[in-house]
């Protein structure tokens, strides 16, 4: 068989393309990445279902009811941050817990992270029921991911991680916490995260203390009583 003449060979690319063309992010280079999406969706199908299912349960009718007593009190404290830059017992007209009005009116009854989180939502989305509950509803979604991630890391069994997360997603008390404009939803997320970073101590690789430290600081400044109980349990386990 005679060799094919160079003049008859069909060139796939135009001769006018620069030499650097093959080094750029072209369609052919992006195509393998796009092809990975179906594989990613398939391997994480359980978690995706849980997130969508939880989103429906948590966000449906989130602002159908007015803020309850404790929700209103905590939201009021958050609104004082918008005025003063830090939480106070009074906005100059209204008061909460007058008997605790010490330290020049600074709110010291509970730690501040939940109030700053809620005040950010009130600042961005306006002072209404939905924005007051929004941060904690979002935390509820992440809590489902948190328990799934921790359980999968601990057991290496997707079925166990799925059912553990499903139990949380369908727990009526948990759903009420996620739909409440108060700090009570945040520890549900921070607990599995803290435990996940804790069990990495026992890995063969060099342990990185930064994730555990960061979550511990956030947890302490969210609800120090629950944080103390969890740390005591961890110390007993060690």
What residue ranges belong to the model's regions?
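Membrane-interface transmembrane helices that cradle and orient dolichyl/undecaprenyl
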Residues: 153-158, 192-212, 219
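Membrane-interface alpha helices of multi-pass inner-membrane proteins
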Residues: 102, 164, 177, 208-224
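Perimembrane helix-loop-helix junctions
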Residues: 29, 197-211, 228-238
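Transmembrane signal-anchor helices characteristic of membrane glycosylation enzymes that use polyprenol
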Residues: 42-71, 77, 83-86
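Short acidic/glycine- and proline-prone juxtamembrane loop motifs at membrane-interface regions
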Residues: 179-184
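Membrane-proximal lumenal/periplasmic loop motifs of glycosylation machinery
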Residues: 62-69, 83-115, 123-130
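Transmembrane-helix signature of polytopic, membrane-embedded enzymes
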Residues: 49-50, 147-170, 189
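Transmembrane-helix motifs of polytopic, lipid-linked glycan transferases
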Residues: 134-155, 193
């Amino acid at each position: 068989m005679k060799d094919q003449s160079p003049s008859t060979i069909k060139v796939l690319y135009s001769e006018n393309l620069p030499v650097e063309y093959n080094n750029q992010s072209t369609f052919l280079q992006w195509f393998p990445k796009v092809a990975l999406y179906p594989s990613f969706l398939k391997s994480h199908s359980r978690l995706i279902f849980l997130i969508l299912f939880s989103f429906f349960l948590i966000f449906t009718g989130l602002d159908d009811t007015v803020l309850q007593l404790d929700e209103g009190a905590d939201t009021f404290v958050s609104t004082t941050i918008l005025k003063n830059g830090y939480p106070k017992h009074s906005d100059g007209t209204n008061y909460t817990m007058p008997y605790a009005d010490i330290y020049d009116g600074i709110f010291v009854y509970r730690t501040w992270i939940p109030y700053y989180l809620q005040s950010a939502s009130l600042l961005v989305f306006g002072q209404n029921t939905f924005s007051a509950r929004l941060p904690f509803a979002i935390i509820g979604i992440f809590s489902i991911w948190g328990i799934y991630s921790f359980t999968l890391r601990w057991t290496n069994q997707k079925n166990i991680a799925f059912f553990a997360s499903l139990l949380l997603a369908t727990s009526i008390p948990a759903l009420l916490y996620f739909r409440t404009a108060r700090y009570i939803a945040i520890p549900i997320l921070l607990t599995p995260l803290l435990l996940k970073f804790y069990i990495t101590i026992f890995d063969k690789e060099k342990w990185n203390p930064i994730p555990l430290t960061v979550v511990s600081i956030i947890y302490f400044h969210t609800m120090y009583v629950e944080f103390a109980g969890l740390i005591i349990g961890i110390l007993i386990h060690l």
